[in-house]
Amino acid sequence: FGMKVIGYDPYMTQEKIGDLCELKATAKEVWEQADFVSVHLPVVPSTEHSIGREQFSWMKPTASFINCARGALIKENELVECLQDGTLFQAGLDVFEHEPIQESSRALFDLDNVIMTPHMAATTEQSVLNCCTSVANDIVAVCNGQEPQVKAQKPKF
């Protein structure tokens, strides 16, 4: 794509990530510089409803916001307001504050600058097959005294 990728992760170093992404010192720098802001966070007390008008106001006037992580990260009413008043150019969502979608999210359906899809893109035949194969291979590896290829890591929050 020829796209320059920038990001922020308080637990990652540029040395670890290599040239895949240019890490910024703060999340705000990413919001201010990116043409596409895509969030990838879990919902924990410190992140729940942590994204709203303030963050959207940092974005370029032509930037796009994408949330495929968790709906509860967003102050959905502020997202709607920013999309309506032009603070935010457009959004792509496949997660919502309340799922299944409730009447409180209805305003999103009336906006021309929002694309919404179901949160199930990873549930394809191939992805399920890959997941099952990976798990089976790692079970065999562990039973044979070897290290698994895919290891779960406890997140640090």
Predicted regions and their residues:
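Rossmann-like adenosine-cofactor binding region
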Residues: P10-R106
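Conserved SAM-binding motif I beta-strand of class I
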Residues: G7
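Rossmann-like dinucleotide-binding domain for NAD(H)/NADP(H)
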Residues: T62-S64, C68-F157
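Conserved anion/nucleotide-ligand pocket segment
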Residues: F1-K4
